[in-house]
């Protein structure tokens, strides 16, 4: 099967590479040409625009930064809709506002193009080894039809519901992760301010109800002051903003999300937006006049 892939960034490039390893023919487009040239050298067909991808493929995956980019690639000049044949399927794996997913899907549908939203979780390491989690919204018929395609890039692929539901699930994930990281930061700050060893506190609580994937992934980074990004603060701000917009659209109260969003905005103002989101602890260190960093 020939598959179009638009958006070859940190996540998109390894995901596309995994499709190629699974035997799919890839037609690729990216605004920056270096990634296109890299995958073309590995056997992909290079395209000069989203429209050219659509001319060559009836299955197209997009992996883009946010809603405006998805809208432009799908509906803009030289976009997918300008050249796609009726019956084309677009699988948008970007993390965007679910309201936007529905609006873009409705416009594509007028031209006989189906849209599925299929955002992912797991970050670059899981994109590389093909174990990302995929949350899918759209028709169940399309989910069943393209399940194997998605599994070529993933460790799990779950159908959530109608179009937009995939992004609702992703935003729920991002809310939980953000609030958990803030809670870990707060707890380690409490420990240090009470003269307790934060590493021993971490070891004491990780086997109980407070134990979590977030605790195990982020507490060691905080104590090492290693903020090399697995997921940057600026990207989490984008996701929380989308979550708040989605919540406001349906009158869902998200007070804790709003609070953590303000913490992240404060960190951005201090120049930390490129740091891993575990750098939320810097906010707590600053206002508490302390550090959770362990001495070597």
Give residue spans per PLM region.
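Rossmann-fold dinucleotide-binding core
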Residues: 95-174
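Hydrophobic beta-strand scaffold residues
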Residues: 26, 46, 115-116, 157, ...
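Active-site-proximal catalytic alpha-helix in oxidoreductases
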Residues: 129-137, 158, 163-194, 203-217, ...
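NAD(P)+-binding Rossmann beta1-loop-alpha1 motif at the extreme N-terminus of oxidoreductases
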Residues: 1-63, 88, 93
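Rossmann-fold NAD(P) dinucleotide-binding segment
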Residues: 50-114
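Residues in the short beta-alpha loop(s) of Rossmann-like NAD(P)-binding domains
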Residues: 32, 66, 139
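Interdomain hinge/lid region at the active-site interface
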Residues: 163, 167, 211-277, 296
